[in-house]
Structure formats: structure tokens, C-alpha cells
């Protein structure tokens, strides 16, 4: 089992993220994909004994994830999970996400699967609702969180994404479309998010909609 952590200038938050995963899952392979960072993110990953894959420049989360999937495919990794480097994902929920792979090919940790305390602004909420609507049209499946960065994958999906994972801004949404188109079963489980430990959040959902349209 491997953790794929795309990281761009996350030197401040990465040490705690790695330490938490190692503490809970000492047998998991941790792969940090340094996406052209300039703050020493790669050095920290190496210091903590992680596999560090370095991009020559910033390609975005999609490009970083594809590299991580290729690494897993080449080494025959059975299952992998995507985990953010900013500290917002709770590693105690990794087991639940991986357990979902017992009857699914891909599992998504949803912030909105049940009534929860995770709040977003009205404009961002509207963007998320629109993305959910578009994905439902294309897949016929109702997803509550199309932009979640907390996901798990079985080996067949890893192999698919190693070759076809989208590298543009809409990677999280398009990944759902690609997996669904290829007949893979995708499921969601509710997860809780934590406050970002460092850095600044992005307007990712608005860029996703712009690219999609």
C-alpha cells in the first residue's frame, strides 16, 4: 500500500503529514511528488525517508499524480491513496478509505456525503454544485464531492491513471469520468477535514469550471 502525496511548496506542513502517516501505518510506502517546489519540500521528503519524485517545474496536481501512479504501476503496488500535503486530510480515516476498496475499484473521501461541519462560501458552493451536476450527466452517478483530493485506488485503476490521468486543472473531475468510462466501480465515504496547517488555499473549483466549459 502506498500514499501518493503531491506537494508544491509545502515544506512547513509536510513534516507533520509524513509523521502522522508513518505513526499510524509504518508499513505504507510514502511517495512525495515534489511539483517544482522552491522551499525545500524535496529535501524534507528525503530526510523523512520517503520516496521523492521531483518534477523539473510546476506542472500541477494532475501531472504530479500521474508520476506517482507510474511509480506505483512499475512496482506492482496493490493499492494506493492520494493524500494532500497541507495537513487538511485526517490520516486516521485512511483505513476506512482503503476498506472501501474491498468492494470498489476507487474510493473517494467526501466532505459532503453526510451532514457535516465542513463549510464553504456561497460562491464556492455554487461552483461545487455545478461540477457535481456535470459529472452526474456524464457518468449517471451522483457524487457529493467531485473535487476531493482524498482518494484510494486498486491496482487496475492505478494502471489506468499511470497512462491516462489528466494533467490539466480539471484532473479531479476528469479522473472520475475516465474511471467511470472504463467501467470501474467508484464509491464515496464521508470524511472530515481539518484546517489547513500552512500555505494558502486555491480557487481550484472555479478554474475547474472554466476549463470544463
Residue ranges and their predicted role:
Residues 2-6, 54:
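Short hydrophobic beta-strand elements that form part
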Residues 34-42, 87:
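A conserved acidic beta->alpha catalytic loop
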Residues 142, 164-167, 176-194:
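Catalytic donor-sugar/metal-binding loop of nucleotide-sugar-dependent glycosyltransferases
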Residues 51, 55-57, 61-74, 79, ...:
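Acceptor/aglycone-binding surface of glycosyltransferases and processive sugar-polymer synthases
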Residues 1-2, 29, 174:
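Cell-envelope/extracellular polymer assembly enzymes that use nucleotide-activated donors
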Residues 9-23:
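Short, well-formed alpha-helical segments that are part of the catalytic scaffolds
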Residues 10-13, 37, 90:
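Donor nucleotide-sugar binding loop of glycosyltransferases
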Amino acid at each position: 500500500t502506498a500514499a501518493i502525496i503531491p506537494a508544491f511548496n509545502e515544506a512547513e506542513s509536510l513534516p507533520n503529514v509524513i509523521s502522522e502517516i508513518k505513526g499510524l501505518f509504518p508499513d505504507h510506502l510514502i511517495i512525495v511528488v515534489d511539483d517544482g517546489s522552491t522551499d525545500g519540500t524535496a529535501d524534507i521528503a528525503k530526510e523523512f525517508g520517503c520516496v521523492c519524485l521531483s518534477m523539473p517545474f510546476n506542472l500541477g496536481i494532475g501531472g504530479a499524480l500521474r508520476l506517482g501512479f507510474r511509480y506505483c504501476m512499475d512496482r506492482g503496488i496493490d493499492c494506493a491513496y492520494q493524500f494532500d500535503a497541507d495537513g487538511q486530510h485526517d490520516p486516521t480515516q485512511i483505513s476506512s478509505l482503503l476498506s472501501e476498496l474491498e468492494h470498489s475499484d476507487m474510493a473517494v473521501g467526501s466532505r459532503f456525503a453526510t451532514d457535516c461541519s465542513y463549510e464553504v462560501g456561497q460562491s464556492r458552493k455554487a461552483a461545487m454544485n455545478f461540477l457535481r451536476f456535470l459529472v452526474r450527466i456524464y457518468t449517471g452517478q451522483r457524487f457529493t464531492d467531485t473535487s476531493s483530493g482524498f482518494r484510494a485506488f486498486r491496482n487496475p485503476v492505478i494502471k489506468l491513471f499511470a497512462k491516462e490521468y489528466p494533467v490539466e486543472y480539471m484532473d479531479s473531475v476528469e479522473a472520475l469520468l475516465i474511471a467511470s468510462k472504463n467501467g470501474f466501480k467508484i464509491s464515496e465515504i464521508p470524511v472530515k477535514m481539518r484546517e489547513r496547517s500552512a500555505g494558502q488555499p486555491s480557487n481550484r473549483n472555479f478554474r475547474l469550471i472554466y476549463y470544463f466549459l
